[in-house]
Amino acid sequence: MSATVLNGVSDADLESALLDAPVSSLYDIAYTYGQLYVLATEEQVDADIDSEHIRAMTPDEQSQLYDQDNSLLSVRVNLSNGTPTLDDDVIDIERLSWEKAIKVGYAYPYRKRGAMIAHSIAHYANSKGEETTAKYARHRLTRWPTDEAVQQVAESDDQGIVNALAQLGSDDAVIETVTKAVERAVSDLGGTFDGLVSLKIKPPKGNQFLYPGQIPILNEAMVGKKRDRFESYSEAEDSVGAGTDFVTGDEEVPVLGITPGSPGDYIHAKQVEKFPGLDPNRGWQSRPMTVDTAMAVAAGGTVIDACSTYFGGGVEVTYLPYLAGTMDSDDARWLYRLLDDVLEGETITDVLQDRFYERSRRSNRLRAFVFATATDLDRKDKLIHESSEMEVYVPGDLAEAHVRALDAWPFSADDPRQVFSISDSDDAQLSRENSALFQSVLSGQYLKRTLFEPQRNPTKDANAKVFGPAEPRRRSDDRVFGPDNLPLEATIRLVSTDPLPRKRMVRSYARRIIQDQNVLLGAADKNRDFPRYTVLRQYAQWQALHATDAFGTEDFSPVPTIDLNDPPSMSEDTITNETKLEAFINNHDLLAADPERRMAFVLGGLVGRLTAYQDRKEIESTMVRRYSVDSITKRNVARITGEVMSANHDYSAAESLS
């Protein structure tokens, strides 16, 4: 944990950055994240940069460049002698870092879609060749300083820095020099450049070169460009009106409804192309925010992106932690240190697990806003499910209940009634490891590995990542889960304490057994004909879900649970396979109370026992292959029972003769 982050920020500054009321929406969370992120950034960067300017920057947007040498190319401009000129050393190439990205003042539209460009002087060249990189370098002098929004800010530029840059950009000789210098530098790098293209400027009467983000007027211009983009986004020419800020509650202030870069990337502007007949210039009447609030919300996007875990099928589940109740400065430090751990590379599931076992006063107040998004083929993120409150105890309590189920007599090698052996399994859901179970609940794997998966691709199963850190965002190569996907829906319900649909779960369990068996029956390994571990996972999970009251009150009697603490009523001396089977049935009301269900259960057990015998005798056409789960119906069960009983008689007779 970054134990000292925000220690250098005063209580007064922290509390002025916080909302005066408890968090009540995703916007509130994003605003809080953005405000704290800006304060932490300002604290950590060794440069005198105003927090208002940092709030508009996006240093993490191209964070992959931090691991690369030669990832920042700057054209050196000297404005110190009254006449703007290029420096004798025209080009400077160095390694970009997070702090340097702040000093450069890099500002990019959050989760950019389409052909949008950066608001800052710095522009990203994505592995571009000599000519394209040189073009980007020229534009730092020809296009950026002459932008309309930048020129409006230039009117208050006492030092004339913006116009001096524009003057250089209008000089053909200067542009030719820049072009040749950049092309030569990129050629020396192997012909391509992957990094930011920017400027280094020695300001009027200055004695050293500075990055653009270290020069206030250039930051003002960058903010002006971003403000202009907010106000005229999409079809709107001017979306500003007078209203009450949706987040802060400030009344009668200039507000806008256009918020490109909103949290989760699914709360977006009113767009006339999506809602015919709407006036985009009146977008401020929907979730109105001031520009400052909108920028804080957008700044929170960096933190929000870090709080996602990959569910599968192009779906991400995002957990956004917050504290219940109104926060004070110490609460803010505690919360941001949690978030900073995620920003520093820990997974959100790891961090939430650590806080669960912390068992502190604040961890008891810890909640999370949860939502799931899917990336469709048009490369836009779609909201599938959301919930405003997850309490951290939910996955922790469920993990502990699951371990108790695995310690109970059906799995216990110390109990003569044991029916399930899991000693040979390294499956996380059968390993009694609380930490793995906790994370599997949050990642969705806990239910994804037991419930039927629609559109499942069996060819990917062997390489599927079951537990661990979230995988990278996936795009068009993955199938997309829709709102009818029960594993995803049930995961969001489970962590949000919304009741699980019990009947749908039971049907889905059965379909998953069939699904997994069909995969096994089609595999080259003929010794694996039945998804044993799927059934064991389902059994332990069912007990754990009931133990934590995860189901609703829908009528489904009798409740199919057992007394996990029931003491053994028989000893090793008296136990037989018959008495063990009888004990199992008698301890499960759902079997004991229903003759048809009991008969089907015993039939399945007999098919399994005969298959084990056939495997020992190396008989390839086994009973479980002949009578797979999905082949048995109410119409043919009587015939199949007779055939299985006949086979049992024949094998018993043959065994007696041998």
Give residue ranges: language-model regions.
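Extended alpha-helical scaffolding segments
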Residues: M1-T192, G206-Y211, I217-N219, E252-G257, ...
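Structural beta-strand/beta-sheet cores of well-ordered domains, especially the beta-sheet scaffolds
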Residues: G195-V197, G241-G243, S286, E316-T318, ...
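Class I S-adenosyl-L-methionine
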Residues: P203
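Short Cys/His-rich Zn2+-coordinating modules
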Residues: G213-E235, H268-P276
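Short, flexible, mixed-charge glycine/proline-rich loop motifs
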Residues: R229-A242, D279-G283
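Eukaryotic N-terminal, low-complexity and coiled-coil-prone scaffolding/targeting segments
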Residues: A242-G243, E251-E252, P260-P280
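Short cysteine-rich clusters marking metal-coordination/redox-active sites
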Residues: D245-G249, T290
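Short beta-strand-alpha-helix junction that forms the catalytic/metal-binding core
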Residues: P276-A296
